[in-house]
């Protein structure tokens, strides 16, 4: 979904500071290239990062938003940010195609003896041409695999990545079972009509040749795949996990590999035990967390993260926040109040009453809430006084207020 900058004459010049953690694609930094943006580590308005483990010390009193160039936000102290009225963004979908393509690659690696075949071919480096031909023809039977066409893939999580994967595997002639109890209407529209939506996780697990996970890491999804549901897998199923390592219980997976319940485990999250198993060439294929590591994905994530931070700082717009609701209001004046507060009855009346007491006219306003948190955008016909801003700021349940 494209994001738009407000370039109308209502915008007045204000300088914002931002701090970047990790390396960020230049295309993203260019979004903040105007004179009103300064890269400054002292009291930045916006923190922009990829996988950097953000701590409480990185958050200052001036921090207004944190923008993650990527989907996962388990490296950000979200609860603390929310209490302080700091909006946390991520970039769902920006790296979806990159992950989708690597899942397809993982499925092929798990099916065709590609890695083993390559290792064998390299072991023949000192053989003559005649010897090579004989050896290859004699040994290739050991690398015989299976095709994807006609097999069943179970996709757990039908968001941006899951829906793209469903489209791709449908073209490959696979049967598709999807499971996502939180599937949105928008997500449903992206799915091919051939996708069979499972009523239960057990149904998907027991009917899928390939199972691929596309879930965020939360308290509810940690050890999502473990002994208790591995029992439901088809014998010899292949599991692909490019989401988060802790979604899968590795100890239980190794046991399932030993007893043949699972034939192959492909994951982007190596551990010492998994590496040991992979070196032994016993059903584990490891990748060094490269699911989103493409030039295109890094650019998409960086641009999206910086655009979201910019739109929030300049206009109070929120898109793809993990802790506050989406909100957008077209500008009707150059004086906009952005108020973060708890979602309680009477808050709007209290705020607007104070504005009325100052004889200020409200041009337009909007209020949105998510769980116990809310944000209100108010456009004023004339500039509010610092006295009014301080008065609203001191209200019970108001977390922060700013003029943008």
Model-derived features: positions:
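Rossmann-like adenosine-cofactor binding region
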Residues: 55-57, 181-277, 293
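Glycine-rich Rossmann-fold phosphate-binding loop(s) that bind the pyrophosphate
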Residues: 158-159
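Phosphate-binding beta-alpha-beta segment of Rossmann-like dinucleotide-binding domains, i.e.
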Residues: 84, 92-152, 320-322
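A conserved regulatory-domain signal marking ACT and ACT-like small-molecule sensing domains
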Residues: 319, 323-404
